[in-house]
């Protein structure tokens, strides 16, 4: 990655309200990377739902997996080792940490994950790739299998008013989507017309069924109906592809064009976004992780916390945080998921050593669908994909930088309930 220098464009306006300030870049040599916070989705896991309803909506047998439901797979571990290796090369290139074998003190790095097997293991494999042979502490709650409150995207507002507004927001979001083609494609792949559900419950066409949204305090936003079934089915099919199952076992050999993959994943993306990205929901469920990031990265002086902070959670954490912070729409090339397996939001704090001004750059770093399937080695020469992101209230220059002060204001606004 190439980074160019930022110089601050001061606003000409001398009166309130002051608009966010546009940064500008000229000289890369003056830019210093001071601190990085990564919010990562865990890497490749087995399907969370691979029995029950999925066996009832098709007359076919789903492929077997060699690990427990929801666990990181061996390939997922290897993929994260490669991601860690790439990040270490990037860290060394930008001189973020000391030039030594194990820059792994608490002042250098801090790894913190949700307390599930797939998130803890992701951090362990990342550390093995980034800091091989080094002692690296992985911080998490002691009870493995129980969600850490920081990463738990549950509703914390139990008021009837909130529930009413949240349900309406989910309904409005779903109404704005066009999912008919995706449902029809999935009906064909599953051969749902010959399934047990069709014979016993007349569920022969997913698009003809209604969804019912669920908002309850201390629980994740939920939905019952075809969207939930579709999400579970498409998730299982995506994971088969990433894991490297033989082509005739991936969706029984029926998803063989980019157009078909795109259609199916409109359903999975719709599930994630309908449940977790309506603003009223996003700001509520993302508040714990936003607060953690604010106190450990955004609202502290440089040097008070580790230079490289690595958090491992879930797609719901990333989706809700991005909505709460008002990220602009983005596209991830060569991926069908909007929050892909192993994908990472990389928050970078840079300083212009001439002006002494600080800047923020945010990138989505992720493995393409084929990099995941091929278990592709990653390095500076063969990197993962990078997409520079932009926040609505933190305008970026041509090289993707926005002012640190505006970024702090974005975080403060996101934390407002």
From Swiss-Prot:
GO molecular function: glucose-1-phosphatase activity
Catalytic class of the enzyme: hydrolase
One term under GO cellular component: outer membrane-bounded periplasmic space
Record's keyword annotation contains Transcription: no
Gene3D superfamilies, sorted: Phosphoglycerate mutase-like
Keyword vocabulary terms for this entry: Hydrolase, Periplasm, Signal
Keyword set includes Endoplasmic reticulum: no
InterPro entries registered for this protein in UniProt: Acid_Pase_AS, His_Pase_clade-2, His_PPase_superfam, Histidine_acid_phosphatase
Record EC number: 3.1.3.10
Location relative to the cell: Periplasm
Chain segments annotated as coiled-coil in the UniProt record: none
Active site feature: 42 (nucleophile), 315 (proton donor)
Binding site for substrate: 41, 45, 118, 220
Domain of life assignment: Bacteria
Catalysis: reaction(s): alpha-D-glucose 1-phosphate + H2O = D-glucose + phosphate
Signal peptide coordinates: 1-23
Pfam families: His_Phos_2
Self-association and partners: Homodimer.
Family affiliation: Belongs to the histidine acid phosphatase family.
Protein's name according to its UniProt entry: Glucose-1-phosphatase
Annotated source species: Providencia rettgeri
């Amino acid at each position: 990655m190439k980074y160019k220098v930022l110089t601050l464009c001061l606003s000409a306006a001398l009166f309130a309200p002051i608009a966010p300030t546009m940064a500008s870049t000229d000289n890369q040599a003056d830019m210093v990377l001071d601190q990085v916070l990564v919010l990562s989705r865990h890497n490749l896991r087995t399907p969370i739902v691979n029995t029950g309803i999925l066996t009832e909506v098709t007359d076919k047998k789903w492929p077997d997996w060699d690990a427990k439901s929801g666990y990181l797979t061996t390939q997922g571990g290897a993929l994260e080792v490669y991601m860690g290796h790439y990040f270490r090369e990037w860290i060394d290139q930008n001189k973020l940490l000391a030039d030594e074998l194990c820059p792994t003190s608490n002042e250098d790095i801090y790894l913190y994950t949700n307390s599930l097997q797939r998130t803890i293991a992701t951090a362990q494999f990342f550390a093995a790739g980034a800091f091989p042979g080094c002692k690296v502490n992985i911080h998490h709650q002691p009870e493995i299998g129980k969600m850490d409150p920081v990463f738990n995207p549950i509703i914390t507002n139990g008021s009837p008013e909130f529930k009413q507004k949240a349900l309406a927001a989910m309904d409005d979001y779903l109404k704005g989507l066009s999912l008919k083609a995706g449902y029809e494609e999935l009906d064909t792949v599953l051969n749902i017309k010959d399934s047990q559900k069709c014979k016993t419950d007349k569920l022969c066409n997913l698009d003809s069924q209604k969804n019912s949204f669920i908002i309850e305090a201390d629980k994740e936003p939920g939905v019952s109906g075809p969207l939930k079934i579709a999400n579970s089915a498409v998730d299982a099919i995506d994971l088969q592809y990433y894991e490297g199952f033989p082509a005739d076992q991936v969706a029984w050999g029926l998803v063989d064009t980019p157009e078909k993959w795109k259609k199916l994943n409109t359903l999975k993306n719709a599930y994630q976004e309908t449940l977790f990205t309506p603003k009223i929901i996003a700001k509520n469920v993302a508040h714990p992780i936003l607060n953690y990031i604010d106190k450990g990265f955004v609202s502290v002086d440089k040097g008070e916390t580790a230079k490289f902070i690595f958090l491992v959670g879930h797609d719901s954490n990333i989706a809700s945080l991005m909505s709460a912070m008002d990220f602009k729409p983005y596209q991830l090339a060569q991926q069908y998921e909007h929050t892909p397996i192993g994908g990472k939001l990389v928050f970078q704090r840079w300083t212009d050593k001439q002006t002494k001004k600080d800047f923020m750059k945010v990138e989505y770093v992720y493995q393409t669908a084929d990099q995941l399937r091929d278990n592709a080695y990653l390095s500076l020469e063969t990197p993962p994909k990078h997409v520079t992101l932009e926040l609505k209230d933190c305008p970026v220059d041509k090289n993707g930088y926005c002012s640190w002060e505006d970024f702090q204001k974005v975080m403060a606004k996101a934390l407002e309930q």
